[in-house]
Amino acid sequence: MLLHIKQVLTSEELREARGILADAPWGDGRITAGSQSAHAKNNEQLREDCEETRALQQLLLRGLERHQLFFSAALPKQISPPLFNRYGGASNSFGNHVDSAVRFLRDGSGRVRTDISCTLFLAGPDEYDGGELVIEDTFGVQRVKLPAGDMVLYPGTSVHRVLPVTRGYRTASYFWIQSMVRSDEQRRLLFEMDNHLRHLRSQYGETDSGVIGLTSTYHNLLRMWLDV
């Protein structure tokens, strides 16, 4: 499932993030790449342990906490600490690759199975040319270039790439989610059911017998498929 989530960050939060990024210490993005993706990766990245990264992580996670759509779609069990990258100039692209199945946390606190990959755009599409995120999966080939503050979720199993940036700079955050429901197909079905339930609640109310019955079915399926 590929999902566009709008306005994860407010305009005020975006201004704050851009202010932090303006003075951030960018370095070679290959330091976090796996053995295969290191050959394809040509971008810049903030160090995981720098003050700017920590401030941006708190800002982004606060934004995620507000979004019911995000929780409905991802059913997150664990979210890896968000990282931040930049494409432009001589460091302007990332060739075809698949994310590693497991992300080991830098502080040694554990690991995250990368069920879902996430990219949150911090630069608007008018600020750079090129830089589309191209994702290949069962839904076909999708080219993604979103407004600043918007985010895309897609399966961690997808082959994807970032096309060369030929003008300006493309800044973004990226991170991974270990979901309580491992299967992408099962998550999609639960997400669709949850969307339909919200519509039915708005039409018929919480006490309608059909709404209660479908809510029970949703939670029974969730209980069956949960990996906690």
Swiss-Prot record:
Cofactor: Fe(2+); L-ascorbate
Residue span, Fe2OG dioxygenase domain: 78-179
Gene3D superfamilies hit by this protein: q2cbj1_9rhob like domain, Rabenosyn, Rab binding domain
Lineage of origin: Bacteria, Pseudomonadati, Pseudomonadota, Betaproteobacteria, Burkholderiales
Top EC category: oxidoreductase
Positions with a binding annotation for 2-oxoglutarate: R170
EC number, as in UniProt: 1.14.11.-
Entry annotated with the keyword Iron-sulfur: no
One Gene Ontology biological process: intracellular iron ion homeostasis
A Pfam family matched in the record: PKHD_C
Cofactor note: Binds 1 Fe(2+) ion per subunit.
Binding-site residues, Fe cation: H97, D99, H160
Protein known as: PKHD-type hydroxylase Vapar_1809
UniProt cross-references to InterPro entries, sorted A to Z: Oxoglu/Fe-dep_dioxygenase_dom (IPR005123), PKHD_C (IPR041097), PKHD_hydroxylase (IPR023550), Pro_4_hyd_alph (IPR006620), Pro_4_hyd_alph_FE2OG_OXY (IPR044862)
Keywords, ordered alphabetically: Dioxygenase, Iron, Metal-binding, Oxidoreductase, Vitamin C
PROSITE patterns (UniProt xref): FE2OG_OXY
Keyword DNA repair: no
